[in-house]
A protein has these predicted regions:
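Beta-strand-enriched cores of mature, soluble protein domains
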Residues: 1-164
Length: 164
């Protein structure tokens, strides 16, 4: 190669918005391995709604398996099932959503107490991967998606975008 070429920046296309209901966190204790890796926290998912290009309900039974390495950061690994409605009624989408949430220690404490925190004060970004039950939704498995989220006292709001 002789010269570096700058490629066009990817664009984002909004796909859907989720309102996910959760119940109280389960503290699973300190993680051990190659030194202390932080704490494990499990957040049960109790339901929710999906609006946008795909529509449906977040079914109860999923969970967010969090690794909390310090007072400011949580590595999230949420897995849950969406029952689709509208054009795809009867079909399902399985979501595996990896995320990073970072805030000041004070804002993290407020979130843990169930107090509201301005979403602009919290870095909450995700990269969902989907499994689908119908060929008409295969585009969900053939593209890269990113998202932004906000934690509320009883749930999470997430917007998913497809990289173009």
């Amino acid at each position: 190669m002789t010269a570096t070429r700058t490629l066009p920046a990817p664009a984002l296309e909004h796909v859907c918005d989720l309102e996910v209901s959760v119940s109280a966190p389960i503290d699973a204790g300190v993680l051990m391995g190659l030194g202390t890796q932080g704490r494990r926290r499990i957040i049960p998912i109790t339901g929710g709604s999906v609006t946008g290009r795909i529509q449906g309900r977040v079914l109860p039974g999923g969970a967010d398996f969090q690794r909390v390495p310090n007072d400011t950061t949580a590595d999230l690994d949420a897995r849950y099932l969406i029952a689709l409605e509208g054009d795809y009624a009867g079909e399902h989408v399985f979501v595996m959503n990896r995320a990073l949430r970072r805030a000041t220690p004070e804002d993290v404490q407020r979130l843990l107490k169930g107090e509201p925190v301005d979403p602009d004060r919290v870095y909450f970004r995700c990269a969902p991967v989907f499994e689908v039950s119908t060929p008409q939704l295969q585009w969900l498995t053939e593209n890269i998606f990113v998202g932004a989220g906000a934690r509320a006292p009883n749930g999470v709001s997430i917007s998913f975008y497809m990289l173009k």
